[in-house]
Amino acid sequence: TIDRFLTNDTHCDTYIGWVGSDFVEQGRRAAEAMIRESGGEGKLAILLGAAGVNVTDDRNAGFLEVLEAADTNIEIVAQQTANYIREEGQTVTEQLLTNDPDINHIYAHNDEMALGAVPPLKGFGKQPGDVKIITIDGTQGAVQGIIDGWVSGVIESNPRFGPNAMDALEAFYTGDGVPQVTIISDKEYTTENAEAELAN
């Protein structure tokens, strides 16, 4: 399978292995970026992906693991589902800022929700950089958001599964054996490399 694990206990005779990113590690790296960009202080809101999805659970678990272990003054004031959808990210962010205008950090489980958070920030008079947004995926829009100043960091979720998947199939058919799990590497986009990476 690619990008998603099998999620039930039913035996599958044709299952070979899995290729994808380590979603827990993505969350950990997002937390490290948040701590770095925030200076370890402030009010944080989390835009959660869809409930019951392993990516959502893993990205949140990794993030909270690092944040809770670190000696920071970052306060999580809200965790609300926005289902990986830009429009829901916008609606949820509007609600969160209405309830607490002092929110100055946002962790979004994906780029679409992060980009949806930008219009409400503008509507509340925020300037680029006033609210630190850390997100995961690595879409062009989010990397451009770093250049524009609205996004502080992006952890990539590498979409280039093809070569690894083909290597696994070739190994299977030649009898060389296939690993049960193949983790692909994910980049990190920051203010230091965003322009160069977007040009690639």
Q: How would you name each of these model-derived features?
A:
Residues 1-3, 18, 43-48, 78, ...:
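Structural recognition of the beta-strand scaffold that forms the well-ordered cores
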Residues 1-25, 36, 43, 139-147, ...:
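Flexible loop/hinge segments that line or gate small-molecule binding clefts
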Residues 13-15, 39-43, 70-76, 101-105, ...:
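Loop/turn elements at helix/coil->beta-strand transitions in domains of secreted/extracellular proteins
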Residues 18-44, 88-90, 114, 138-142, ...:
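Hydrophobic alpha-helical segments within soluble ligand-binding/sensing domains
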Residues 26-30, 54-74, 88-92, 116-120:
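Short, solvent-exposed amphipathic alpha-helices that sit
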Residues 43-46, 67-86, 185:
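Short beta-strand elements in bilobed, periplasmic/extracellular small-molecule ligand-binding domains
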Residues 47, 51, 66, 70, ...:
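Hinge/cleft segment of the Venus flytrap/periplasmic-binding protein
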Residues 63, 77-144:
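Hydrophobic alpha-helical
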